[in-house]
A protein has these predicted regions:
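Export/targeting segments at the very N-terminus of extracytoplasmic proteins
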Residues: 252, 354-411
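Helix-turn-helix repeat elements of alpha-solenoid scaffolds
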Residues: 173-185, 210-220, 245-255
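Catalytic and substrate-binding regions of cell-wall glycan-acting enzymes that process beta-1,4-linked
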Residues: 476-536
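Substrate-binding/active-site groove segments that recognize
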Residues: 400-401, 418-441, 454-463, 485-486, ...
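Short, functionally critical alpha-helical segments immediately adjacent to catalytic or ligand/cofactor-binding
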Residues: 387, 392-415, 427, 455-460, ...
Length: 553
């Protein structure tokens, strides 16, 4: 009887957390739901399906055959799914494992295949010339590795490397680590080598390694010769412009930013290049041009603030029919159908269809998503859904939740990312599990699709980040996306410390991980807009926000 009462209570509590007046019929929110192969087979390939395949693979006592069937239903590009499957079900051949784990002395007794498997370039760099010669003499069947070792064994690694082929140079550059790059490659590279590198598919990756390492200043200056290269992408030109700014050459930076603007397709990329053209020239015509942009990002909002122009395309409320919607807001696959359907041919007739589907407060985020697409993002919605939950927090916390949730999920409860982040606040499963333990709550991964639960956990996580980063919205955003440890490591490089000519904008561009860098800017723009809407008695300027971006480390 007690067990039945507990089960009934748990079911009631789950339903209460969903909605005061609604009991969800979503299958995976039902008690004792378990992913099966039959259930998976009915679902289309998507990030959502990959998430549920992961839940299936994590079940106990699963046969290899069934695990393989489920794995092969996936997208094929999901790194998390691949890792889980390989770690749990795919075994390395014993002979290969032996070679991977072998010490240098043990490898000396092995054949050429085992040496090729077990000896990395990084390990080879630490070997004596005698040991290098020993391995070189055993590697005739593996000429690429043999020649790599010959270069490492030479008296002039740099000269031999730059006179080798471009693939080998790239392999050494990426595989041998930061110390090797600083000690051996921090030189003014020959123009012909730079030009060859610029044609490689890994060139932007190469640039990130160079530009974000202040110890590679000589190599950085080698890149100036690309200022007139018309084949480079907008993003490559922009990064080269930042590199020129870091090396105190505003004239060359101007060339790169100008090329970046002309090559850019996305409005945000055009605005970013325009803003930096303004910074390196102080020419107000670039601000004027920025102020005409329809996108509300930190660059355009700041330009409008400096020119005393009020944004005219921010929408905070939307009229609804206020009838109960039949749309299942928890079903990721239903939402995926909407996303696909609105990608093209979104005309008045189709828009009216969604006005008739998304009719209540629960589906307000879904409607504004469609409206933004319909308006080609030239009208931007800063709605405040889930007020019954979020209004209970202080204003700063409300602003942070809305700023992050808008960027993370557009407030869609059923959102699932490629990395399996869930819900309105896009919380990773490992994090939600950890939070449940700290809150001493029973854990059900599917409850993260319920806004009440997901926002509660997101708020808990924000509390820890707010303490670590002094309530600074930009640093909190970096940590929410890239992790607190990564954010601290970036700040400890000296970012957001100086009060230089281009700060804090230069520090904002020196965050090494692209997703985190751009995420922070978007959340900061959201923060500015939401603060001045929800906290209208204490409005804040972007200038003031920028002045507050000072590292606590």
């Amino acid at each position: 009887m007690k067990k039945q009462l507990f089960s009934l209570t748990a079911t009631i509590l789950l339903n209460l957390s969903i909605s005061a007046n609604e009991i969800s019929t979503t299958d995976f929110l039902q008690k004792d739901f378990k992913v099966t192969l039959d259930w998976l087979e009915q679902k289309p390939k998507s990030y959502a399906k990959d998430f549920f395949i992961l839940q299936y693979l994590n079940q106990d006592n699963l046969s290899f055959e069934n695990a393989k069937i489920a794995y092969e239903m996936g997208n094929g590009t999901n790194a998390t799914l691949k890792k889980v499957f390989n770690d749990k079900y795919k075994k390395t051949a014993p002979i290969d494992l032996k070679c991977y784990r072998a010490t240098i002395e043990e490898l000396k007794d092995e054949d050429s295949k085992c040496i090729a498997l077990g000896l990395s370039l990084k390990e080879a760099l630490q070997l004596s010339k005698k040991d290098l010669e020993f391995f070189i003499n055993k590697l005739d069947p593996y000429p690429t590795l043999k020649y790599d070792l010959k270069i490492i064994a030479s008296d002039d690694i740099y000269t031999n490397l730059i006179n080798s082929d471009i693939k080998r140079f790239s392999r050494f550059f990426f595989d041998l680590g930061s110390n090797f790059r600083i000690k051996v490659l921090n030189k003014k590279l020959p123009p012909e080598l730079i030009n060859k590198l610029s044609k490689e598919k890994d060139f932007e990756r190469f640039l990130r390694y160079v530009v974000y390492d202040k110890n590679l200043n000589n190599l950085q200056k080698s890149l100036f010769i690309l200022k007139d290269d018309k084949s480079l992408t907008s993003s490559t030109n922009f990064l080269l412009g930042i590199n020129a700014v870091n090396n105190n050459d505003a004239k060359i930076a101007y060339n790169f930013f100008f090329n970046s603007f002309n090559k850019a397709y996305l409005r945000i990329d055009k605005d970013k290049a325009l803003f930096w053209l303004y910074l390196v020239t102080q020419n107000n015509s670039f601000l004027q041009e920025l102020s005409k942009s329809w996108d509300n990002n930190i660059y355009t909002l700041y330009a409008k603030e400096l020119l005393d122009i009020k944004p005219d395309n921010l929408i905070y409320t939307v009229d609804l029919k206020n009838t109960k919607s039949s749309f299942d807001i928890y079903d990721a696959f239903k939402w995926m159908e909407v996303v696909e359907d609105t990608k093209k041919n979104l005309d008045d007739t189709k828009l009216q269809k969604y006005y008739d589907i998304f009719t209540d407060e629960d589906t307000l985020p879904h409607l504004t998503f469609v409206l933004e697409r319909y308006n080609k993002y030239k009208t931007q919605y800063y709605i405040t859904p889930f007020r019954n939950i979020i209004k209970n927090y202080d204003v700063y916390k409300q602003v942070m939740i809305y700023s992050i949730a808008r960027q993370e999920s557009h407030f869609i409860p059923s959102s699932i990312s490629f990395s399996s982040a869930q819900g309105v606040m896009q919380i990773m499963p490992f994090l939600s599990l950890d939070i449940s333990k700290k809150l001493n709550e029973n854990y059900n991964i599917y409850e993260q699709f319920i806004p009440n639960k997901n926002i509660q956990y997101g708020s808990f996580h924000l509390d820890t980040l707010m303490k670590q980063f002094d309530n600074n919205p930009l640093f909190i955003a970096y940590a929410y996306n890239g992790g607190a440890g990564y954010t601290r490591s970036q700040l400890k490089k000296g970012l957001f410390k100086e009060k230089g000519k281009f700060e804090p904008f230069l520090s904002m561009e020196m965050i090494s991980f692209n997703e985190t860098r751009e995420y922070g800017k978007k959340v900061l723009a959201n923060y500015y807009i939401y603060n001045n809407y929800l906290n209208s008695e204490n409005k804040i300027s972007l200038s003031t926000i920028f002045e507050s971006l000072v590292s606590p480390y």
